[in-house]
C-alpha cells in the first residue's frame, strides 16, 4: 500500500492512499460475505446467489462501501505513522479511483494536531503585583467571626426592624394568579440583606408577629427569570416569628472561644498573617496568568476549528452540569436568557480558542524542556485526591484507568510548566 502527503494547510492534512487491487479484491470478497444474506437475485434462494451475479444484478458498486471500510483503516494508520501525523478528528474520504481490477485510490482529509512555533518564553518581563493587608481587612474578618458565632434569640414586644430575622410564609400573585417560584413556608429572611426583590424586605419592617399583609414589588427589567422581568407582583405574607442576632463582644474571651489563642490581639495577628499569605498566593497566581498570556501571545499555531468546537462542547457540558446543581438545565437557561445554542457557542468561541492555544503552547514547552510528572509527584497527587474524595488510597488507585492516571500526570506536568515559565520571568516593580 502506498501513501503520499499532498498538503498540510492550517493544520488540515490531505493524504492520498493507494490500496493495491489485490487488497481491494479482498475487501470486495469480505463485503460480499458480510451482506450475502441480504441479496435477492431471481432464480436463487435469498442469500444463495454467487457474487458475480449479485454484482451484475445490483451493480458493481453495491459492495464498495463495506469494501472501502475493510481496507481503509490499515492504509490510513500506516500513512499517519509514515508522516508522523496525529489526527484530532475523523477523516473525510473522497474516492479518486475505484473499480474491479484496479488499485483503489482514496483521498483522506483530516484535521491534525497543529505544529506549535514557540516564541519567547524565558525571561518574560511582568509587573510585580502586591496586595497589602489593611486594618479594615482584619476587622472585616473579625466581624465575620462574630456573625458566625452570634446567638439567635426571639424578639418580643416590638415590630420588625432592620437586621431582624423574619420567619415568613409567602405566596406571590401576578394579575391575581400565583406564579412558579413565588411561594415559600417558614422562610428565614434577614431584613436588609437584599436577598429578595428590591422593596420586599422594607415592607416587612414595622409589622408584628402574627400579622398577614400584602407586599407589592416590581421585578427588575434584568431579573433572571424572563417571565417575571418588569412585572408587578403582590405577595401575601404572614410574619410567623421574629428573631435577632446577639453578637458576642470582641474581647479575649471571644478569642478563646473561637480559636486556640488566649488574647484578641493574638487572634488579630493570626488573621493578618493568613490574609498576607492569601494575598501573596493570589498575587503570584495573577502574575503567573499574565506570564502565560504573554508566552501564548508570542507563539504561533494554526488551530483547526474542530479542536475549538470540542472545547466548546466540554464547556457546554460543564455549564449544563453546574446548572443542574441549581435545579436548572441548559434548555431552561437558554429560555431564560433568550439565547439559542448557536448564540452560546458563538459567545464561547474566543475563550475556547484561547484555552486550546494555551494548552498546546504549554504542552510544547513541557516537551521541549522535558517537564514530566515524577512518581513522587503522582503519588502525592493521588493521596490528595483520595483524601478529598474520602476514600482509601489503594482502593482509589485501583479504581483509576490508565487513561485517567495519564490525565493526572498531564495535569501535574501542565502546572509544573507554568511554574517553570514563572520562575524564568523577570519581575519588575511599577517604579521601574
UniProtKB/Swiss-Prot annotation:
EC number per UniProt: 5.2.1.8
Species assigned in the record: Caldanaerobacter subterraneus subsp. tengcongensis (strain DSM 15242 / JCM 11007 / NBRC 100824 / MB4)
Domain notes: Consists of 3 domains; the N-terminus binds the ribosome, the middle domain has PPIase activity, while the C-terminus has intrinsic chaperone activity on its own.
Similarity annotation: Belongs to the FKBP-type PPIase family. Tig subfamily.
Keywords: Cell cycle, Cell division, Chaperone, Cytoplasm, Isomerase, Rotamase
UniProt domain PPIase FKBP-type: residue ranges: 163-248
Protein location: Cytoplasm
Entries under PANTHER family matching the protein: TRIGGER FACTOR CHAPERONE AND PEPTIDYL-PROLYL CIS/TRANS ISOMERASE, TRIGGER FACTOR-LIKE PROTEIN TIG, CHLOROPLASTIC
Protein origin, superkingdom: Bacteria
EC top class, as a word: isomerase
InterPro entries named among the record's database cross-references: PPIase_dom_sf (IPR046357), PPIase_FKBP_dom (IPR001179), Trig_fac (IPR005215), Trigger_fac_C (IPR008880), Trigger_fac_C_sf (IPR037041), Trigger_fac_ribosome-bd_bac (IPR008881), Trigger_fac_ribosome-bd_sf (IPR036611), Trigger_fact/SurA_dom_sf (IPR027304)
GO molecular function term, any single one: peptidyl-prolyl cis-trans isomerase activity
Function of the protein: Involved in protein export. Acts as a chaperone by maintaining the newly synthesized protein in an open conformation. Functions as a peptidyl-prolyl cis-trans isomerase.
Pfam families per UniProt: FKBP_C, Trigger_C, Trigger_N
Gene Ontology biological process terms in this record: 'de novo' cotranslational protein folding; cell division; chaperone-mediated protein folding; protein transport; protein unfolding
Protein's recorded name: Trigger factor
Substrates-to-products reaction catalysed: [protein]-peptidylproline (omega=180) = [protein]-peptidylproline (omega=0)
One GO location term (cellular component): cytoplasm
UniProt main location, coarse: cytoplasm
Amino acid at each position: 500500500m502506498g501513501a503520499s502527503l499532498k498538503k498540510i494547510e492550517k493544520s488540515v492534512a490531505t493524504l492520498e492512499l493507494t490500496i493495491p487491487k489485490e487488497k481491494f479484491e479482498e475487501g470486495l470478497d469480505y463485503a460480499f460475505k458480510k451482506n450475502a444474506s441480504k441479496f435477492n437475485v431471481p432464480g436463487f434462494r435469498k442469500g444463495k446467489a454467487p457474487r458475480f451475479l449479485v454484482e451484475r444484478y445490483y451493480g458493481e458498486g453495491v459492495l464498495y462501501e463495506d469494501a472501502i471500510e475493510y481496507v481503509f483503516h490499515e492504509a490510513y494508520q500506516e500513512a499517519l505513522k509514515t508522516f508522523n501525523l496525529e489526527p484530532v478528528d475523523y477523516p473525510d474520504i473522497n474516492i479518486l479511483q475505484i473499480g474491479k481490477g484496479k488499485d483503489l485510490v482514496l483521498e483522506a482529509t483530516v484535521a491534525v494536531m497543529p505544529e506549535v512555533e514557540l516564541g519567547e518564553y524565558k525571561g518574560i518581563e511582568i509587573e510585580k503585583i502586591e496586595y497589602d493587608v489593611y486594618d479594615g481587612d482584619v476587622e472585616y474578618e473579625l466581624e465575620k467571626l462574630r456573625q458566625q458565632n452570634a446567638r439567635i434569640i426571639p424578639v418580643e414586644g416590638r415590630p420588625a426592624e432592620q437586621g431582624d430575622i423574619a420567619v415568613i410564609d409567602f405566596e406571590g400573585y401576578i394579575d391575581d394568579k400565583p406564579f412558579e417560584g413565588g411561594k415559600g413556608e417558614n422562610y428565614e429572611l434577614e431584613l436588609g440583606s437584599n436577598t429578595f426583590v428590591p422593596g420586599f424586605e422594607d415592607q416587612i419592617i414595622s409589622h408584628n408577629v402574627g400579622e398577614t399583609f400584602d407586599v407589592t414589588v416590581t421585578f427588575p427589567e434584568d431579573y433572571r427569570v424572563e417571565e417575571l422581568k418588569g412585572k408587578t407582583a403582590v405577595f401575601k405574607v404572614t410574619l410567623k416569628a421574629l428573631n435577632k442576632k446577639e453578637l458576642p463582644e470582641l474581647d479575649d474571651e471571644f478569642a478563646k472561644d473561637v480559636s486556640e489563642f488566649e488574647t484578641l490581639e493574638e487572634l488579630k495577628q493570626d488573621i493578618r498573617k493568613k490574609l498576607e499569605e492569601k494575598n501573596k498566593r493570589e498575587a503570584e497566581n495573577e502574575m503567573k496568568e499574565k506570564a502565560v498570556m504573554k508566552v501564548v501571545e508570542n507563539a504561533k499555531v494554526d488551530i483547526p476549528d474542530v479542536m475549538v468546537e470540542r472545547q466548546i462542547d466540554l464547556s457546554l457540558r460543564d455549564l449544563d452540569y453546574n446548572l443542574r446543581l441549581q435545579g436548572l438545565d441548559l434548555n431552561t437557561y437558554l429560555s431564560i436568557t433568550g439565547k439559542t445554542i448557536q448564540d452560546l457557542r458563538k459567545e464561547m468561541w474566543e475563550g475556547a480558542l484561547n484555552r486550546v492555544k494555551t494548552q498546546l503552547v504549554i504542552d510544547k514547552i513541557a516537551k521541549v524542556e522535558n517537564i514530566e510528572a515524577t512518581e513522587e509527584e503522582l503519588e502525592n497527587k493521588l493521596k490528595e485526591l483520595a483524601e478529598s474524595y474520602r476514600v482509601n488510597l489503594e482502593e482509589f488507585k485501583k479504581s483509576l484507568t490508565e487513561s485517567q492516571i495519564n490525565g493526572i500526570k498531564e495535569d501535574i506536568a501542565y502546572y509544573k510548566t507554568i511554574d517553570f515559565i514563572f520562575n524564568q520571568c523577570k519581575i519588575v516593580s511599577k517604579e521601574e
